[in-house]
Amino acid sequence: MEWTVWWDMRRHPGEAQWSRAVEKTQAEALDRAHRFLKLGFVVYQIRDTNGAVFMDEVQITQHFGNAS
């Protein structure tokens, strides 16, 4: 089972353009998303092990606040 972080270096419309990072746990996925935000990347969503959206872009931004 894996958690998926959908992200990109700059904003692209449509999921087909997004990059994907895979982690084994929720904590690792959140940590990866936080690191991407600190680098100035766009984090679109985090999906859980069932493929359901765990956090969308707005929720991720609210969760981490100003990541820099």
Language model features: what each stretch is:
Residues 38-68:
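Short, mixed-charge low-complexity intrinsically disordered segments
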Residues 4, 10, 25, 50, ...:
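Intrinsically disordered, low-complexity regions of eukaryotic proteins
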Residues 13-20, 52-56:
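Surface-exposed loop/edge segments in extracytoplasmic proteins
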Residues 14, 23-48:
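A short, charged, amphipathic alpha-helix used as a generic interaction element across diverse proteins
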Residues 1-18, 47:
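Short aromatic-glycine-(Arg/Gly/Cys) micro-motifs in beta-strand/loop hairpins
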